[in-house]
UniProtKB/Swiss-Prot annotation:
The keyword Cytoplasm applies. The gene is pdxJ. Catalyzes the complicated ring closure reaction between the two acyclic compounds 1-deoxy-D-xylulose-5-phosphate (DXP) and 3-amino-2-oxopropyl phosphate (1-amino-acetone-3-phosphate or AAP) to form pyridoxine 5'-phosphate (PNP) and inorganic phosphate. HAMAP family: PdxJ (MF_00279). Its EC number is 2.6.99.2. It comes from the Bacteria. This is Pyridoxine 5'-phosphate synthase. The lineage of its organism: Bacteria, Pseudomonadati, Thermodesulfobacteriota, Desulfovibrionia, Desulfovibrionales. InterPro entries: Aldolase_TIM, PyrdxlP_synth_PdxJ, Pyridoxine-5'_phos_synth. GO terms for biological process: pyridoxine biosynthetic process. 3-amino-2-oxopropyl phosphate binds at N7, R18, G192, G213, H214. Keywords: Cytoplasm, Pyridoxine biosynthesis, Transferase. The record marks E151 as: Transition state stabilizer. Belongs to the PNP synthase family. Homooctamer; tetramer of dimers.
């Protein structure tokens, strides 16, 4: 069955509003672990708007579960990944003006660059993933460079204005999952998933992980992290492998 990995960036966002020490995303990460999530995600952005370098360092040293590091494909981030050695790195596009990651990484046409970029990361035994749109060309390009995983962007599905539009976006994702699996790729889903819309994937086989952050942190404000994570993990536990 698929597993839950939880993004704690929004805890760091709240901390950075006051440039203080609280709330601590490391504490949130440990609570997420205790609640049964299989991994923690942090996005170390180039502008350091939420997660900071010391957060990654502390999590890499102390977490018992998997640390997933989201990052742009820059020399600086490559060096950090090699130094901290997370379980997985996920390459994502970044724009300074965006509130959150707005779309998938352009892989098609950049295969040679990305393959070379990931080579030293793979050599250290670190898994990699590419955050991409549910698009055939992007899926095939990801497979061509030898990346073991992709994460399909579910934001268009989550933000669809009508039920029909949502179903159309879901169908694109399901087709992309099937293609990726046929090419030997592991498939993760993430962006905009919540306690309601995640059921749209309850009958879809071939998903390895669900990457969820905002909706869990939002619920945790009222229920606490352990309850919020446990509720989502219980939903996913009923999904097929």
């Amino acid at each position: 069955m698929p597993v839950l990995v939880v993004n704690v960036d929004h805890v760091a966002t709240l901390r950075q509003q006051r440039k203080g020490k609280e709330p601590d995303p490391l504490t949130a990460a440990h609570l997420v672990e205790l609640a049964g999530a299989r991994g923690i995600i942090v996005h170390l952005r180039e502008d350091r708007r939420h997660i900071q370098d010391h957060d990654v360092e502390l999590m890499a040293r102390t977490l018992k579960t998997r640390l997933h590091l989201e990052m742009a494909a820059t020399e600086e981030m490559q060096a950090i990944a090699l130094a901290r050695q997370p379980y997985m790195v996920c390459l994502v596009p970044e724009k300074r003006e965006e509130l959150t990651t707005e779309g998938g990484l352009a892989v098609a046409g950049r295969e040679a660059f990305l393959k070379d970029y990931l080579a030293p990361i793979h050599a250290r035994g670190i898994l990699s993933s590419l955050f991409i749109e549910a698009d055939e060309a992007q899926v095939r390009a990801a497979a061509a460079i030898g990346c073991p995983y992709i994460e399909l962007h579910t934001g268009h599905f989550a933000d669809a204005p009508t039920r029909a539009a949502q179903r159309a976006e879901r169908d694109k994702i399901v087709r992309a999952i099937g293609l990726a699996r046929s090419l030997g790729l592991g498939v993760n889903l993430g962006h905009g998933l919540n306690y309601d819309n995640i059921y749209e994937f309850a009958d879809v086989p071939g998903i390895s992980e669900f990457s969820i952050g905002h909706s869990i942190v939002a619920r945790a404000v009222f229920t606490g992290f352990e309850r919020a994570v446990a509720d989502m993990a219980a939903i996913i536990a009923r999904f097929p492998a």
